[in-house]
């Protein structure tokens, strides 16, 4: 939804509810309502307008908390922010943008910047394997910026790999 707000396709909740009717999610909700927490399709709302409005409100609230959009609940308007544009263009998850928004400061050290980006949601499923620890230890000695954390933390592994990639060793 953030990308659609950035593109200008969506500027208010009414347009967002309408846009949602063109998605695969909507088709699946109609075909298999139980899977999406809809006990049965209400005869008074067969097109799930109420449910779509709930989803739009929840998504807009979440994006607003992450500072990716400005959401005026009373007027129903949605407006993109600089963070929303960045997230949309680079496919960054809202959880990562929220971490950046809350923790990125004007005068951070390189150590803290690498640590912050290594905490991105996109890297959360990267495992630490026992057979990698020796190699990571060798890398940690060669990276240009000191690494905070232990080799048992996925964020530390990501930090090391980011620096290794950037410094091309």
Question: Can you describe what each PLM-predicted range is?
Answer:
Residues 1-31:
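Core active-site phosphate/anionic-ligand binding loop and the adjoining beta-turn-alpha structural block
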């Amino acid at each position: 939804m953030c990308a659609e707000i950035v593109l200008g396709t969506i500027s208010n909740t009414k347009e967002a509810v309408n846009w949602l009717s063109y998605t695969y999610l909507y088709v699946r909700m109609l075909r298999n309502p139980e899977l999406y927490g809809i006990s049965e399709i209400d005869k008074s709302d067969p097109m799930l307008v109420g449910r779509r409005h709930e989803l739009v409100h929840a998504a807009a609230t979440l994006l607003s908390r992450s500072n990716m959009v400005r959401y005026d609940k009373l007027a129903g308007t949605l407006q993109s922010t600089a963070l929303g544009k960045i997230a949309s263009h680079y496919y960054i998850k809202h959880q990562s943008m929220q971490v950046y928004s809350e923790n990125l400061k004007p005068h951070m050290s390189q150590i803290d910047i690498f640590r912050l980006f290594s905490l991105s949601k996109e890297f959360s499923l990267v495992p630490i394997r026992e057979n990698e620890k020796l190699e990571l230890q060798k890398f940690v000695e060669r990276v240009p910026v000191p690494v905070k954390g232990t080799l048992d933390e996925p964020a530390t592994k990501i930090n090391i790999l980011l620096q290794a990639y950037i410094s091309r060793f």
